[in-house]
Structure formats: C-alpha cells, structure tokens
C-alpha cells in the first residue's frame, strides 16, 4: 500500500493506519532527512527479526538503530551521560546516528550487541509517526545492489515496485536523498565520527 504524506497537514486516518500497522508488527518504508528507510516498531521483537532477515543481517554482529521523536525518553533506550546528551541536543533533529550503549527497555535482540544507534531525523513525517506510536522505530536504509539504478531507493513508485512485497505500507514523501547520516560513536564517552555523511557535527 502506497500512502502519500507531506511535511504537514496530513490526513489523520492515514497516520492512524500507519501506526496501527506498526503496532501489529508490520513493516513500513518511509522518507527521512537522509535516505528512504525501512523499519518497524522497535519494541516488537518479531518485527525486528523480520527486518534483520530482510536485510540479511545478524543482529549479534551488526549495529541496529532506532528513530525517536525527541530526546525526552532517550534514557529508556540508551545509556547517555551529560556531555553526550548536550552534544545530541545541539545537533538533533538532524542527519546523525549516535551510537550509544543500550538501555533497559530494548528487546533482547538489541542487548546481544550492547550498542544501539539513535536517530532523531529532521523530517516531520517520520517524527510525527513516532510521536503517535509513542515508541521508537527500528530503522535501516533500503538495500541497493551494485549495478542497480539509484532511483530504486529514491523514487517512491520504483521503491514500491521493488520492495512492495516486503513492506506493509510505503510512504510516498517525494524523491528521497542519497547521502547517509553521519555516524557518531559515543560509547566510550568521547564522541568519535566513524562515518561522515550528510550531517556536520557541531561540537
């Protein structure tokens, strides 16, 4: 199902349908401030396992990331000291993934890795969905094969053509970007940029 959403003034019924799908353990594809991504309710372990199978990743070996509406409940999902919190507050919402040690509320599948990526994208659509869901969304970028056209991860109609069988809902938010988020590792206290992407860190 392809649903067109905008930065504001969306149909409440469309938003409610998306939230319902997530609460039932479904998978959605959605725009962010970087690239289109695929995700699910982060606290539904079976849905998380479904995403891992789709991406062909082992959660014991790969970092998993979640989208939060804001930083107000961040301590439930990750361990964050004062300096790291201030750094995140200066840079979020924005095109960053902050790697932190996992908190107590995340499913066991996260705790096997002991680290979790935290995103608060500068994109109204996915943040509004997060707010209505009242829970984080597991997030990972759409896969692109080596010889495949970039349009298959940027153009909603082509995304639907390729991934429609995997996702319960695809959100059409217009043409997506191609640059990933900047990854900042904060697990050792001192912030370290491990991948420079779209975001430029204000320290």
What are the residue ranges of the model-derived segments?
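Active-site-adjacent structural elements in enzyme catalytic cores
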Residues: 1-203
């Amino acid at each position: 199902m392809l649903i067109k959403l905008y930065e504001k003034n969306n149909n409440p019924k469309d938003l409610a349908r998306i939230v319902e799908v997530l609460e039932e353990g479904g998978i959605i594809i959605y725009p962010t401030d970087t690239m289109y991504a695929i995700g699910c309710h982060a606290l539904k372990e079976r849905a998380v396992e479904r995403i891992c199978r789709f991406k062909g990743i082992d959660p014991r070996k790969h970092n998993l990331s979640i989208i939060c509406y804001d930083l107000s409940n961040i301590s439930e999902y990750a361990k964050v000291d004062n300096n790291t919190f201030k750094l995140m507050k200066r840079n979020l919402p924005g095109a960053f993934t902050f790697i932190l040690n996992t908190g107590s509320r995340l499913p066991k599948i996260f705790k096997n890795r002991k680290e979790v990526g935290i995103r608060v994208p500068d994109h109204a659509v996915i943040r509004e969905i997060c707010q209505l869901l009242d829970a984080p969304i597991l997030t990972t970028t759409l896969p692109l094969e080596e010889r495949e056209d970039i349009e298959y991860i940027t153009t909603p109609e082509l995304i639907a053509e390729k991934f429609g069988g995997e996702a319960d809902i695809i959100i059409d938010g217009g043409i997506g970007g191609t640059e990933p988020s900047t990854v900042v590792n904060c697990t050792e206290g001192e912030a370290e940029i491990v991948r420079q992407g779209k975001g430029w860190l204000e320290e």
